[in-house]
From Swiss-Prot:
Protein name per its UniProtKB record: Major pollen allergen Bet v 1-M/N
CDD domains linked to this entry: Bet_v1-like
Organism expressing this protein natively: Betula pendula (European white birch)
Binding site for brassinolide: K55, Y82, Y84, N101
Listed InterPro entries: Bet_v_I/MLP, Bet_v_I_allergen, Plant_def-hormone_signal, START-like_dom_sf
Keywords assigned by UniProt, alphabetized: Allergen, Cytoplasm, Pathogenesis-related protein, Plant defense
Any one annotated GO CC term: nucleus
GO molecular function, one term: signaling receptor activity
Signal peptide: none
Family (UniProt): Belongs to the BetVI family.
Source species taxonomy: Eukaryota, Viridiplantae, Streptophyta, Embryophyta, Tracheophyta
Stored SUPFAM superfamilies: Bet v1-like
Function: May be a general steroid carrier protein.
BP GO terms, sorted: abscisic acid-activated signaling pathway; defense response
Protein origin, superkingdom: Eukaryota
Amino acid sequence: MGVFNYESETTSVIPAARLFKAFILDGDNLIPKVAPQAISSVENIEGNGGPGTIKKITFPEGSPFKYVKERVDEVDHANFKYSYSMIEGGALGDTLEKICNEIKIVATPDGGSILKISNKYHTKGDHEMKAEHMKAIKEKGEALLRAVESYLLAHSDAYN
């Protein structure tokens, strides 16, 4: 088994606390609403949303994958940090054991925020992760962020 790391940063015009509330804490409800072409639904299979919770994310018909299961590893409200692991389905296939993800949202002096994202791909056997594949996953996540950001800009009273 190998572990491949991919780190990235993305900026947002939305303040850190508001973005954390919308994108992380209520993302299970908001993302299927603002990006139904990407995610059909999110349901808690076990747990209450905190560490140990298992979620099933269902993708729309025509997507390359039907679903993915994720386990919540950490929710740090004070530091706007969220960690979770993809543990079943989706892109894991025969080559990945799991993908561990950490998102930390940091306030910027201009009132916006920076999302610092760390992904750890745990491969099966001697499989290697290609940079293009990791970049494609990052771009999909960024598209979800932009959909949430657009919603928040259009609904200034939401998630304050």
